[in-house]
Amino acid sequence: KKSLKKGWQVTSISTKPPKKIRYLPKVKYILCDITKKKSLKKNIKKTFNYVVNLGGYVDHINKKKTFKSHYIGCKNLTEIFLKKTPTAFVQMGSSGEYGRSQSPQNENSTCNPESIYSQAKLLSSKHLINLFEKKNFPVTILRLYQAYGPKQDFNRLIPIVIKACIKNKKFPCSHGNQLRDF
């Protein structure tokens, strides 16, 4: 919304149209799977100043689909945008890339991803860092920790916890021994 208020043209690429609650009339929506390179090339004709890769399969049960959407999708996007030279390519990584590394983590912390999702995110980060080092690709990688906010799906951690607390019910959680530097 803020990008639109600033007068920016916003384009969203997704395999599905946005839910009604998230639909914004001034956004150009392109239905396309970023894991399918030919389709992606066909759908991305113009240049963009800024690219923010929020893409990826949310349900991590299907490991192959999870890997493809997060890693192969990122590689396909960068292949296209290497030729279009955006001002910045922002990759949404994950705190999961660190795995159980000692907290607090920083950019020099050892990464030990434990899930296919985290492995795909780390491979994407390594791919992007390599592009930066070899081709000066303008990348910024953000490793977010429990991002949440308005209009978030109810099947995510923070909404699950809030809903359970309101209803005075138990919610799934760990033993609480993890430390995260937010």
Predicted regions and their residues:
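NAD(P)-dependent short-chain dehydrogenase/reductase
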Residues: 126-181
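Rossmann-fold cofactor-recognition segment
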Residues: 24-36
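Conserved Rossmann-fold NAD(P)-dependent oxidoreductase catalytic core, especially the SDR/UDP-sugar
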Residues: 53, 75-116
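Conserved glycine-rich Rossmann-like NAD(P)H-binding loop of the short-chain dehydrogenase/reductase
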Residues: 8-17
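NAD(P)H-binding glycine-rich loop region in Rossmannoid oxidoreductase-like domains
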Residues: 34-69
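Active-site YXXXK catalytic motif of short-chain dehydrogenase/reductase
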Residues: 70, 117, 121
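Conserved sequence/active-site signature of Rossmann-fold short-chain dehydrogenase/reductase
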Residues: 35, 97, 147-149
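N-terminal Rossmann NAD(P)H-binding glycine-rich loop of SDR-like oxidoreductase domains
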Residues: 1-6
